[in-house]
Amino acid sequence: MATYSRLTRFLILIGLLNALLIFTTAARAQHPADHWEFSVQTGYLKKVKNNSPFDYRIVPTQAVWRSPTVFNLWQGDSGARLTVRNRFAAVFETFARGPEDYYLAFTAAPSIELWAPDQKTALFYEIGGGAGLLDSKSVPGGQGQNLAFNWFTQAGLRHQLSNTLALTGGVYFTHHSNLGMTSPNPGIDVLGLTVGLVWRLD
């Protein structure tokens, strides 16, 4: 009888541990940072340096993919996390001011995200670059050639509207350059604000 009682308690303990493991795994799988995401982001950028005589104004629209967390830089007992994810984007910029009309590019960057314990709000920082093509014009102070490289950085805030949808807002800076392939090489430096919608893919 004592053996039967011990066996019963053992089986109950195993069942409770298994339920706890399932619950923990399910909770982690629900974290937004552990899923592939797609987002559409747009904004308005103004020239911030005098490297060109043109007063550039750019509207950047991006299709962005973010990977699940690659690794955690830090994880607190409360559930807060500092994560690193991969960010890839197809960029379409329209020039509201300036001799060029558009810029098409691809970019890649790490996305560093500090998540609150409630898994609904995160601060993010991204820094990266890429390359693309614009419709250059033969005018002094313009970009001089179609091939242009880019470097960008962005910091902002995201908030989950639901388990599968989020809203983002940020401060965005980007630099365009042809790396000295033309002389002069005026480049473009613009700074502004962005907003975006994020959808979970899996």
Positions of the model-derived regions?
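Transmembrane beta-strands of outer-membrane beta-barrel proteins
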Residues: 34-40, 82-90, 104-106, 123-129, ...
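Membrane-embedded beta-strand positions in outer-membrane beta-barrel channels/transporters
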Residues: 60-64, 107-109, 152-154, 194
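Cleavable N-terminal export/targeting peptides
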Residues: 1-33, 202
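Outer-membrane beta-barrel "beta-signal"
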Residues: 61-63, 188-202
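Helix-adjacent hinge/juxtasegments
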Residues: 99-122, 127
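Transmembrane beta-strands of outer-membrane beta-barrel pores
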Residues: 42-48, 67, 90-96, 112-114, ...
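Short loop/turn motifs that connect adjacent beta-strands in outer-membrane beta-barrel proteins
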Residues: 28-35, 69-84, 115-122, 161-165, ...
